[in-house]
A protein has these predicted regions:
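Active-site anion-handling motifs in enzyme catalytic cores
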Residues: 1-330
Length: 330
């Protein structure tokens, strides 16, 4: 029986096995719902290419756009990866839209490879000012400009058509922690108790790192959330706590009060490259005092000038659209 099994392997091992079973079930469901979302909402080619046959696409396409997010982060992706479009034939139009460098430092060898890669692009942009500066330093001229993340090119009305209806009737805090710490989650629980709010969370799942603390964190866990449910969870929250760039994006688009925990490394120190992505976005929207550093308390009643934020994002949206139009048609 179950007690004999616990005795044979130990309580700790039994709990560990139960956790992984729950986590991987959630991961499988999430992947299934994600694919369903893609099938229903994205227009994709009938042919699915991989690294071995991407060159065949030159028969059908004249323009290639790579982006966005951290596709050019040398800490995550090799500088000879497919994200630099090495398979595209000479004379074709290669455009980079809003890739992110992510890394705060780039080695001299990486710089040489990056410079060679960029020489074949017609137009280059980055998602962050810091990334644009890095590229301009590498190539020695100001050809790279900062543009909006693609999710911000689209106004809120469109995302309303994608979003699910309100998932929970009760008032809640939405928590989305890609990594985070137990202390950060406990702080969110403290806020929830003080404000008499529930916690809706999306546990972070991948095949390498799953935080066991997520198993008991939150009143409602969206193990299998798809993008429509992710947007809905932000859209209807009383407060949002996160360490995610895109969670900040949708909090801004939907005018939700949000607070950001900076990501920390294994040494417990804040990752400067990660926080720069967030500070660039907050500076663009002129939103202050949202990143919680050094156990800083959140000012839950601090107001945000959303009207000013919207105007600044709209201007950046127009500038980003202009960049794309010029890259595509001039």
């Amino acid at each position: 029986n179950v007690f004999d099994k616990i005795k044979s392997v130990g309580l700790a091992e039994t709990c560990k096995r139960v956790f992984w079973k729950v986590a991987f079930k959630g991961l499988r469901l999430r992947n299934k719902k994600m694919q369903q979302f893609v099938d229903e909402n994205l227009k994709v080619s009938n042919q699915q290419y991989n690294e071995h046959d991407t060159a065949d696409s030159n028969k059908y396409y004249d323009t290639y756009i790579c982006g966005s997010d951290q596709i050019w982060n040398p800490d995550l992706v090799p500088t000879d990866s497919m994200y630099w479009l090495p398979f595209v034939e000479k004379g074709k139009n290669k455009i980079a839209y809003a890739p992110s460098f992510g890394a705060s430092t780039v080695t001299e060898k990486q710089k040489e490879q990056i410079k060679a890669n960029l020489s074949t692009f017609k137009a280059v942009s980055c998602r962050e000012n810091s990334g644009a500066r890095t590229i301009n330093q590498i190539i020695g001229e100001k050809k790279c400009e900062a543009v909006l993340d693609p999710t911000m090119l689209i106004e809120r009305d469109y995302w309303d058509t994608i979003s699910e209806d309100k998932i929970y009737d009760e008032k809640y805090i939405f928590a989305y922690m890609l990594r985070g710490t137990a202390a950060q989650r406990k702080y969110i629980e403290k806020i929830a108790r003080e404000r008499n709010l529930k916690i809706v969370s999306i546990p972070f799942l991948d095949y390498e790192k799953i935080d066991p603390y997520d198993l008991k964190f939150g009143d409602y866990k969206l193990w299998d959330a798809n993008p429509a449910e992710f947007i809905s969870a932000i859209r209807h929250a009383e407060y949002v706590f996160c360490d995610s760039f895109h969670c900040i994006v949708f909090s801004i688009l939907y005018h939700r009060p949000f607070f950001v925990f900076p990501k920390v490394g294994a040494d417990g120190k804040v990752k400067k490259s990660q926080i720069s992505r967030m500070t660039d976005l907050l500076e663009l929207a002129e939103i202050k005092n949202r990143i919680l550093l050094d156990n800083e308390e959140a000012d839950l009643d601090a107001e945000i000038d959303w009207n000013n934020s919207d105007k600044r994002i709209q201007k950046a949206r127009c500038d980003s659209e202009r960049y794309l139009e010029q890259a595509l048609f001039m």
